[in-house]
Amino acid sequence: MATAIGLAIYFAERNRGAYHNLFMTFSQKPEFVSLRGETLLQKIKYVERTEWGMNTNFQAAFERVLETALDHDVLPEEMPKALIVVSDMEIDRCGDRNWMFYDHMKEKYEYCGYQLPNIIFWNVDSRNDIFHADSRRKGVQLYSGQSVTTFQNLLNNIDSTPVKSMEKVIESERYACVRTGNAA
C-alpha cells in the first residue's frame, strides 16, 4: 500500500491541466480525489484517509477521465496518456475476457475527439502471476516489481504495447552483452 500511495502522490503532482493534483480511487464507483497537504507527510496522511472501495471498475474509471475532459474543455494533447493501476493485482476481472468495454470506451473517446489512454497494470507486489491482458492487447501494458528500472521503463514506454515495451527494454544498452554473447 505504501508504494501505491507514494506513486499516487508522484503522478498526481505531475498531472497537467484539469488532472493536476488528482488521483483516482480503486472502487466500483471510482472518483478523482484532489491531493491535499503542504508537506509530503501531510499528503501521505491525506491519501491514507481516502475512501477506497477495494474493487475495480475500469470502464467507470475511463468514463471519469472522459467526463473531466469534457467538463473542463481539455485539449486532446492535455489528456492523460495512461491510467496506471498500481496494485498487488488481486483485483476484479477487467470487464469480460475479450475486453469489450475497452473497445467501447475507445469508440466513445474518439467520438469526443480524444485518444483513449493506455491502461498500465503495475504489480508492485510481484507475488503472483496474474495477468489482466495478453501481450497482443494494444493499449495495455503489464509491469511487475518496485525497482527504479521498472519505474523508468514504465515512464519511457507509457504509450506503447506490451511487446514493444519489452523489446525496447531488451534492446537497451543494459542488455547488449546478453544479445551479443559478450558477457563479462
Language model segments and positions:
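Acidic, glycine-rich A-domain
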Residues: 1-184
